[in-house]
Amino acid sequence: GVARARELAKRINAPLSIVDKRRERPGEVAEMTIIGDVRGKKCIIVDDICDTAGTLCKAAEVLIENGAAEVHSYITHGVLSGPAVERISNSVMKSLVITDSIQATGPVAKASNIRIVPTAPIFAQAILNIWNGTSVSSLFETETLEPIYDGQLQRLL
């Protein structure tokens, strides 16, 4: 988690802050602490998966309480079950971006602050690159992603 966050912060030339969570028991977050200064900053939460969005929405709330100007979240796998959509819709998060690795339910697709990025274009390009014997790691560069998503990248993100 932290190594990926550090790499992302470096790529977008932004300072790194961390939301450290402590659990008393599984499924319950007892305490969240912000490591770093978020005052006046647009914060980006990055995680691999989100189910009911309780922890995600709490993290966004703690960031705002610590002076963040805005909070946006990017989650690879948006399970978004149970109360997730309602929590996200009512949260302080300005936006949540997920991929289509899990098929979106109707409420997820209709939520005004949830955007879904299709994975097919990048997977297709990865397969083509492997077939052609060219670099797959180049797919992690913005200059390579823009043409794959045909100029849609800024709208999606």
Task: Label the predicted regions.
Residues 1-157:
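PRPP-associated nucleotide enzymes
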